Amino acid sequence: MGRMHAPGKGLSQSALPYRRSVPTWLKLTSDDVKEQIYKLAKKGLTPSQIGVILRDSHGVAQVRFVTGNKILRILKSKGLAPDLPEDLYHLIKKAVAVRKHLERNRKDKDAKFRLILIESRIHRLARYYKTRRVLPPNWKYESSTASALVA
């Protein structure tokens, strides 16, 4: 996928495994993988961090092939899903960091401009999640309360 506010084409991406079946050497069952997901989610890890740990430590290439569901769906069924979607959370976290930087460096014009771009991405993503009913329709990003969202 291309970049929104940069000239890069963004062609690089990871390739999915060709076979969608569970590898024969994988000894974990669907229930074992789900238990691992619950355990890692209770530690406070995000769905993508859980996927990386399962891939690197347990040899689960794609959770969906083993369990039949994606990590976020498994977490939602148990009520362990994060309140904010992960990509929106990280954008808000980045905006808070840039705002904190601007408090110390008021004349940093480039940071001011980048903050505008980050916040426009936040608004665009929030609009998307409102139409998908992931966020409530009255949810609004405000820079004054943003640090409380990511704390």
UniProtKB/Swiss-Prot annotation:
Gene field: rps13
Family: Belongs to the universal ribosomal protein uS15 family.
NCBIfam families (alphabetical): PRK08561.1 (NF006331)
Organism: Xenopus laevis
Keyword tags: Cytoplasm, Ribonucleoprotein, Ribosomal protein
A Pfam match: Ribosomal_S13_N
Record GO cellular component, one term: nucleolus
Record protein name field: Small ribosomal subunit protein uS15
InterPro entries: Ribosomal_uS15, Ribosomal_uS15_arc_euk, Ribosomal_uS15_N, uS15_NS1_RNA-bd_sf
